Amino acid sequence: MKIILALLIFSAIILFHELGHFLLAKKNKIVVTEFSLGMGPRLLSTEKNGTRYSLKLLPLGGSCAMLGEDMEDESKGTFNGAPVWGRIATVAAGPVFNFILAFVFAVLIVTLVGYDPAEVTQVESSSTVAEAGLQEGDIIKEYQGYHIDLARDLYLYMYLNNPQEDETIHMTVERDGKDVELAFKPDVQVRYLLGFNRKSTDSLEVASLIPGMGLSETGVEPGDVITSINGTRLESSDDYTAYLAEHPLTSEPVTITYERDGLEYNAEVTPSESRTAVLDFSYNLAYTKTQGFEVLKYGTLEVKYMIRSTLLSLKELLTGGLGVKDLSGPVGVVDAIGSTYEASKSEGMLTIWVNMLYMAALLSANLGVMNLLPLPALDGGRLVFLIIEAIRRKPVNRQIEGMVHFAGLMVLMLLMVVVMYNDILKIF
């Protein structure tokens, strides 16, 4: 069931994208030779008014094939025979239709559950942010120059940009209908750590050591099992957590016992200081119901958030914050939709509908953004050549354009294979 649902959502998004190309092609008197859903051999096919409508074997894509699209033919009815602005509109229509579909889904989501205002719910009384004047009930409108429409905007920015100890935080909040400017430095949380990562096992097994900290300067190695601290026996990882709650580590050395190959060893460890900048306030992540024209407003803001999060993810990819292994292709998307469906079933039908609508809206907005990237073989790459043609008033050499798009297609196909391989590894 979850796979069928995922494929239906994925297919609907692709179909609507291609529908944008199709309708604008017809509007600009460009002959559409085939409008298809899926890839590979045809399963069903019919022809009407010169256009073949097809359902193909693999439900992982679609196409809107136009007459003379990849040729130099500029005769009547061909893609290149249409006015340049008509061609620009036809190519851009696919991504635009994805944004329209995302907006429709977002409006339905807001109608069902509302939106999430970035309202401050708690401020630590002794914190620097309290001294700066932040109060419960304030609505955060701007953070470090980053405009905040929804609580998720703030969460996304803070997730990608951890505050630094010497950083000055600038924040604009709305209070009693007026904007209030705040500036403060983060509080600093000082902790002492042994400097290791645990394995997700019952015993306190060392997964890895953090260079330059505590345990890395002893004889402890990954795979060793820590069995006691200062004489207190530790049977499990939970025991370690409980020990730290009762006896927080300080700069004073501690004695640990660890086991390796059935033998126990002792080591004296001096915990390492760790300083973390923290913002001692909490903000709302729950949803508030709304109605009337506000639904359209917050539906628009939902789509804006989805587009913004996609662009920020691309920025992280380019700057090294994310890698190719973090990308997902059709296989990963189908698995994510299926997993979301399974996780939502226990919460009832409303949760299932909202989560499926959200996944569909996010995917549609994501597809719109990705297709507008100025890369060969994508709609954005084709738009670059068409805009150059509009400015120069003559087309770029068709053969050169074709070779550029072909090279881009080969690179994209290779990337798709790598991403699909990673998706399969993640699943199995």
At which residue positions do the language-model features occur?
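Small-residue-rich helix-interface/hinge motifs
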Residues: 2-75, 370-392
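Internal alpha-helical transmembrane segments
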Residues: 54, 58-125, 407
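Alpha-helical transmembrane signal-anchor/signal-peptide segments
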Residues: 28-33, 113-131, 135
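Alpha-helical transmembrane segments of multi-pass membrane proteins
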Residues: 10-14, 65, 98, 102, ...
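Final/C-terminal transmembrane alpha-helix of multipass membrane proteins
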Residues: 403-423
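Functional transmembrane alpha-helices
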Residues: 78, 82, 193-217, 225, ...
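PDZ/PDZ-like peptide-tail recognition elements
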Residues: 88-122, 156-160, 164-210, 255-257, ...
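Conserved PDZ fold ligand-binding element
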Residues: 129-152, 215-238, 303
